[in-house]
Amino acid sequence: RKGKHQAELYADCLKQMHGQRPIIFYPNGFESYIWDDLFYIDREVQGFYTKDELKRLIDRRATRQDLRTFKVNTSIVERQYAWEAIQRGAEHFVTDNPKGALRGKARKSLLVMATGTGKTRISAAIVDMLTKSNWAKRVLFLADRNALVTQAKNAFTQHLPHLSSIDLTKEKEDNGTRLVFSTYPTIMNKIDGMK
């Protein structure tokens, strides 16, 4: 990608001058990318981050914990196969670089499970892991029906009462909320309304 190498050179100079590696943004003429080269590979973004968001990303470098060593809350998920699913997800997200430092390996993961096997509880346990390990600040939970949104919000509120939550199908948006629940059409309308 054009611009990436030049942005990396600027980041090297800024690190020398200020003693801290910056978060890198670079365009290629059509798209813009963000790159925390100490942790994740680059990815496309739609705009720039605020000063507070950049500070949080830099702070996470020191406070982010290894997901592979997280102890799953057994009051949320009680079954061995659920623990195994969460552990495999954690291993999918994390790797070590050649020097042994923690690195992000993937930003997405997929669990496919049959009806009645505890998808909502496993999701709550994964959110618990990601928030307590300082990998996620906010979480968006999407469902195809209002009833499933309500059910998920109630389950998350029961198992993760320390995280604020909102159902966008019924409540007004609040930027400080940690857990956001919505249907696909509701969130698409919110996105379209921002354009």
Regions found by a protein language model. Give the residues of each.
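ATP-dependent helicase/translocase motor core
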Residues: R1-R138, A143, A147-L163, N175-L179, ...
